[in-house]
Amino acid sequence: MRRRPEVRGSGAPEWSPARLLAALMISSVVALAVLAGLVLAVIGALTQDESDARQAARQAAAPAADMSQQDALATAPMPTADPDDALPGPVSRQAAGVLELPRATGMGPADVPTGYPRTPEGSLAQLAAIDVTAMQSGSMDGVRRVITEWAAQGGPTPETWSGVDGMASLLSAAGLSGAGSPQLAIVVRPVMGLIKGTVGEDFAVVCVNFEFTVTVEQTSRIAIADCQRMAWVGDRWVIGPGDEPAPAPSVWPGTEAAIAAGWRDLRHV
């Protein structure tokens, strides 16, 4: 099993992708003078989300004695970051490490690019393609369709996947229905990544740090990170069975904080 060197976290509570997306939309909503009641409702939801995240972190910190290697890798704590670190910040003069990712060779179910090799880098490229396709759909149907086709049995479902939760938070904070809106534009760029570790050739825990650009009359940007168990099933990588891994820090790509957290620049070859 290959593991990244352990990095000590800061101890700050980690914000989930759903919470960060809701916060992004709150900034746009406030700027557009939408009713204060919406803001209060979202803040209430975020408070509960933080409580749930802390409970999950405590559980991850005390794994069961009979935990498998895959579970141990997935639940191992990641570095943490302040929520403000997810917002655009000064780009570092320091060069980050580089991860070279393969390019897709075909199109798979739910219009997700596929054909990546059976390597850790291939699994990371596949996760990036899954997330980009799901979130750029801008609708609940879009994210549900993607995870239905790209999760192994025992993995995330259209009800439990963090991507579904994130889309629901974004649409709710924007005052939109589950169908989205022609006025909503979401551009998702996988900018940095890391390979947390592998167990054999068919299992990897990988993370992608995305730059989200969301436009609803005005444009806002934020970094959102996603870590998933990736399993080789048949002839492709899919999101594997089990609970989603410990979250990676959502940090604006290219900053000192991102490099310190272990993120590496992604380069397609």
Language-model features: locations:
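Core segments of small alpha/beta cavity-forming domains
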Residues: 94-171
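Conserved aromatic-histidine-acidic binding/catalytic patches
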Residues: 17, 26-27, 115, 135
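Terminal targeting segments of Actinobacterial cell-envelope proteins
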Residues: 1-22
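Structured, amphipathic secondary-structure segments that form assembly/contact surfaces
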Residues: 1-6, 140-234, 244, 254-257, ...
